[in-house]
Swiss-Prot record:
Zn finger spans (Matrin-type): 42-74
Protein name listed in UniProt: Sodium channel modifier 1
Keywords: Isopeptide bond, Metal-binding, mRNA processing, mRNA splicing, Nucleus, Phosphoprotein, Spliceosome, Ubl conjugation, Zinc, Zinc-finger
Phosphoserine found at: 2, 183, 219
InterPro entries: SCNM1, SCNM1_acidic, Znf-SCNM1
GO aspect biological process, one term: RNA splicing
Listed Pfam families: SCNM1_acidic, zf-SCNM1
Description of how the protein assembles with itself and partners: Component of the minor spliceosome. Within this complex, interacts with RNF113A, as well as with SF3B1/SF3b155, SF3B2/SF3b145, SF3B3/SF3b130 and CDC5L. May interact with LUC7L2 and SNRNP70.
Chief subcellular location: nucleus
Species: Bos taurus (Bovine)
Biased composition (Polar residues): 167-180
GO CC annotation, single: spliceosomal complex
């Protein structure tokens, strides 16, 4: 029985909404598949043309139609039914109704709530667990270093051979750490290079010295002083 709501009392509207939601749950219709309008009528949220129905009985009759079932399959991304269901849609609908009526009301309500929650939640990717599986057998990789105790008879020869290598390494490190003595001519050339750089001369890459534009010189000489012989 359809009726119109008179006035703009929000408390009355809330009571009406609660009653309509209760009617939807009582007839096993998920809230995502039907919308309740402000005038008390229902609109199908599955069909693309959004049909508006006056009563809950008309909504249930609409949901049993072919157009609604096809749009329901497109909405949930299911494959179309086989030839047997296309030829006998009434039998398919009757079997579907028998399955829903055979279940208890509480079970069907919880099943619908879980289905709506799963559709809203992001899809679970089971491939994430495969990344952690190779890490489980890693402790067994540390077992190969254990076999050396089996080679005990030859261990004496093997353990004695690395000793001179360690001594040679220490000698090489000592020779590398001690720098070679610098000759007097090389020291004079290094001192001359440092004095030229500190006084504002820079090498041009061709073996010549030029003045730095950012440095002020006391004299107008275009050539740097020569390397002292002594």
């Amino acid at each position: 029985m359809s009726f119109k709501r008179e006035g703009d009392d929000w408390s009355q509207l809330n009571v009406l909404k609660k009653r309509r939601v209760g009617d939807l749950l009582a007839s096993y219709i998920p809230e995502d598949e039907a919308l309740m309008l402000r005038d008390g009528r229902f609109a199908c949220a599955i069909c693309p043309h959004r049909p508006v129905l006056d009563t809950l009985a008309m909504l249930t009759a609409h949901r049993a139609g072919k157009k609604h079932l096809s749009s329901l399959q497109l909405f949930y991304g299911k494959k179309p039914p086989g030839k047997g269901t296309e030829q006998n849609p009434r039998q398919h609908n009757e079997l579907r109704r028998e399955e829903t009526t055979a279940e208890a009301p509480l079970l069907t309500q919880t099943r619908l709530i879980t289905q709506s929650a799963l559709h809203r939640a992001p899809h679970y990717n089971s491939c994430c667990r495969r990344k952690y599986r190779p890490e489980a057998p890693r402790p067994s990789v540390s077992r190969p270093p254990l076999p050396p105790p089996e080679v005990e008879p030859q261990g004496g020869k093997i353990s004695r051979e690395p000793e001179p290598e360690a001594g040679s390494q220490t000698k090489e490190s000592a020779t590398v750490s001690s720098p070679a003595p610098m000759s007097p001519t090389r020291r004079r050339a290094l001192d001359h290079y440092l004095t030229l750089r500190s006084s504002g001369w820079i090498p041009d890459g061709r073996g010549r010295w030029i003045k730095d534009e950012n440095v002020e010189f006391d004299s107008d000489e275009e050539e740097p002083p020569d390397l002292p012989l002594d």
